[in-house]
Structure formats: C-alpha cells, structure tokens
Amino acid sequence: MALRHFLTLRDLSSLELNSILDRASELKRQQHANQVYQPFKGKVLGMIFEKSSTRTRISFEAGICQFGGSAIFLSPRDTQLGRGEPIEDSARVISSMLDIVMIRTFGHNIVERFASFSKVPVINGLTDDHHPCQLLADLQTYQEHRGSIKGKTVAWIGDGNNMCNSYMEAAHMMGFKLKVGSPKGYEPKPEFLAEFAHCVEVFNSAEDAAVNADLIVTDVWASMGQEEEQKLREKAFLTFQVNEALMALAHPECLFMHCLPAHRGEEISENMLDHKNSVVWDEAENRLHAQKALMEFLLNENAKRA
Ligand code: CP
Ligand code: NVA
C-alpha cells in the first residue's frame, strides 16, 4: 500500500474528503464537550515553516497535543534547511524520527520533493500554489452552516492565487460551481484553470462573479512572498473589495469567508468580518478540527501499511 500524503486536495478521493469533513465536525463536538481523546500518544508531528503563520501553526500543534502526541516547530533559520542542506537529505533524516510532517513553504515542488523521500505522511501547510488545509476548514464550515455544498455557487473574489487553486480543486471534487472574479492579469494560471473548465468560470469583475452566490470568499491582494508588489496590486484590485454592496448582489443566505489574516480597507471593507453572514471565526477555529481529522486519517492509513 502506498504512503499517503496531503499535498493538494486531490490526494484524497471525494469519498475520503467527505468522510474527513464529517469526522472534523464530530471531533469538534467531542472537543467542545471536553471529552479527552488521545489515540496518538507518543506520536510526533514535525512542522517546517518557511513562511509566517498564526492559525496553521497553532491548529496543528494544539491538534496533535489534544490527540496525546507532541509537535516540533522547525524553522529554516535554526535548522540546516536554511543553510542549503538538500530537501531530499533533510526529508530522509527528518522523517526517520517523526510520525508525520507538515510543511509551509514557497515552491510547490519543495513539498513534492520532500514527500517523495519521506517515510511518513507529509501535509502541505501552504505553498505558492495550494492551501488545501484551509479548504478542509472552509468546506467544513459551509457544511455546518448550510448543509451540502454540492450544486451551490461559490464566488472567489480577488487574486487567482494558492487559495483560488485549492477552491478550483474543491469545486471539482465537491460538485459546486466556482465563479472567479479577478482583475485582468491576476486570474488563475492557465495551467491550473485548464482542467476545471467544467466547474470554474472566470470574470474580470467582482460584481459579475458575486451575483446569486451562496458563498463569497476572498483573500489578501499580495500573498506571502509578493510584498514588493503590494502597491501595484492595491491599484489593480481597487474594484475587487468584498463589502456590504457586493454581498447584496449575492443570495440572501450567502456566507462570507476569508482564510485570514485580513486587511480591512483593502480586500474587505472595515466591517466585513462582522457582517451578519460572515463565518470567518468559525472558519478559523475549524482549522483545528479539520486538521485533526486529516492527521487521524493519515496516521491510521500509515499504520495499516506497517
Ligand atoms: N489562514 C492561514 O493559513 O493562516 P496563517 O497564515 O496564520 O497560518
Ligand atoms: N494567499 C495567502 C494565504 C495566507 C493564509 C498567502 O499565501 O499569503
């Protein structure tokens, strides 16, 4: 049996994805009821962060601790990863001492190379191309508030970035329609779009994408690693703010999500996070529960191989 990783959403089947989402809500109920559940005593998660993080780091670390295991935070600044030790060598060594590894980095090929030399499951905690863990939380949150997302319409407003790519995969796997509203030149890359013509439509207007949507999602205009483009992007994205007026074009029950951190006054209006249909705080909390369900799935799959 092959070693299972989670580098993009499509490393799971639709069936597995749905069962992880249901399990996430079940683990959430248990956690809220203060039930102790420690199936992974002695298991160690390694967390490699080449970019900053609040939610991803805390949710993974808290999650493995709640399961009875522990986590090691590894930054390139303090390890040999930052001094040029090859990914392949690092992967062999690091994975020989750990039970599961999470990586947040730049190029998606870095997590792929790490995974291909790893002896244990590898989770993508965000690359320049994908943020699949965030999608687990977003899908869980939609399901908890509105039921099945199948057949619904989701509007992605803003940059055709890593989050947008993961939304395209989710649309394909979960059976919803994705309307992407991006400024010219900032649409998702053609190589990602190519596969998803059946479920993704691109507009160069936020309004056209938002009409009748059941969920509106946005993200920062300049992602980590694009800080130098901030000023240029502020101009290009000026008419792509999610605000009360944009929400008014959508379905009355339309939810609002943002992976956070958010920039009030840029991609969202000052009060958007507090909009009556905003579920951003549940979305952030669900990172914990969704990733616990993911780690449980991967650790159990790996145990079956032994
Ligand atoms: N949404 C998200 O991944 O947040 P962090 O960058 O804080 O981990
Ligand atoms: N697109 C953003 C997401 C942050 C969680 C980034 O890559 O910086």
Swiss-Prot record:
Disulfide partners: none
Keyword Transmembrane helix annotated: no
Family: Belongs to the aspartate/ornithine carbamoyltransferase superfamily. OTCase family.
PANTHER family assigned: ORNITHINE CARBAMOYLTRANSFERASE, MITOCHONDRIAL, ORNITHINE TRANSCARBAMYLASE, MITOCHONDRIAL
Catalytic activity as recorded in UniProt: carbamoyl phosphate + L-ornithine = L-citrulline + phosphate + H(+)
Pfam families referenced in this protein's UniProt entry, alphabetically: OTCace, OTCace_N
EC number: 2.1.3.3
Keywords: Amino-acid biosynthesis, Arginine biosynthesis, Cytoplasm, Transferase
Recorded name of the encoding gene: argF
InterPro entries, per the entry: Asp/Orn_carbamoyltranf_P-bd (IPR006132), Asp/Orn_carbamoylTrfase (IPR006130), Asp/Orn_carbamoylTrfase_sf (IPR036901), Asp_carbamoyltransf_Asp/Orn-bd (IPR006131), Orn/put_carbamltrans (IPR002292), OTCase_ArgI (IPR024904)
Binding sites annotated in the UniProt record for carbamoyl phosphate: S53, T54, R55, T56, Q80, R104, H131, P132, C133, Q134, C259, L260, R287
GO MF term (any one): ornithine carbamoyltransferase activity
UniProt xrefs under PROSITE patterns: CARBAMOYLTRANSFERASE (PS00097)
Known role: Reversibly catalyzes the transfer of the carbamoyl group from carbamoyl phosphate (CP) to the N(epsilon) atom of ornithine (ORN) to produce L-citrulline.
Entry's localization field: Cytoplasm
Any single GO BP term: arginine biosynthetic process via ornithine
UniProt: L-ornithine binding residues: N162, D219, S223, M224
One Gene Ontology CC term in the entry: cytoplasm
UniProt main location, coarse: cytoplasm
This protein's name: Ornithine carbamoyltransferase
This protein's pathway: Amino-acid biosynthesis; L-arginine biosynthesis; L-arginine from L-ornithine and carbamoyl phosphate: step 1/3
